[in-house]
Amino acid sequence: LPSLSADAEAPSPLSLKADAPLAHIDSGLLGVPYAKQPIGELRVTTLRLIELPPEKLVVGAPVYLYQFSYESPSSAIKQEVVGHIEDLTYVFKGSQYQDIESPTAYQSK
């Protein structure tokens, strides 16, 4: 990525490569680098990205935004809401399928 000066317009995060360092990606919406945004600010940024006109977005695979209205009884990440890693486990329950081998099962072969 080219270096950005303080007065330069930041590139859209949707047009950057997936392997770009987070510290160099600016939201372009709130004017705060992702690495420095509190969790609540990231949510606002996500909602604002959804509202961008189609010509501002890069064409690609569909992206879905989920908001869950429950609190995890055993949250290791947050106390009041559920962290993203936990929603993958508790809501989608991807670990309940028997056909999926764990990394440790693969190592024991």
Swiss-Prot record:
Enzyme class: hydrolase
EC number, as in UniProt: 3.1.1.59
Catalytic activity: juvenile hormone I + H2O = juvenile hormone I carboxylate + methanol + H(+); juvenile hormone III + H2O = juvenile hormone III carboxylate + methanol + H(+)
Keywords: Hydrolase, Serine esterase
Recorded superkingdom: Eukaryota
GO molecular function terms listed in the Swiss-Prot or TrEMBL record: juvenile-hormone esterase activity
Tissue specificity statement from the Swiss-Prot or TrEMBL entry: Fat body, the site of their biosynthesis, and the hemolymph where it is secreted.
Family: Belongs to the type-B carboxylesterase/lipase family.
Annotated function: JH esterase plays a crucial role in the decrease of JH activity in lepidopteran insects, by hydrolyzing the methyl ester of JH. It is also involved in the transport of JH.
Protein name, per record: Juvenile hormone esterase, isoform A
Organism: Trichoplusia ni
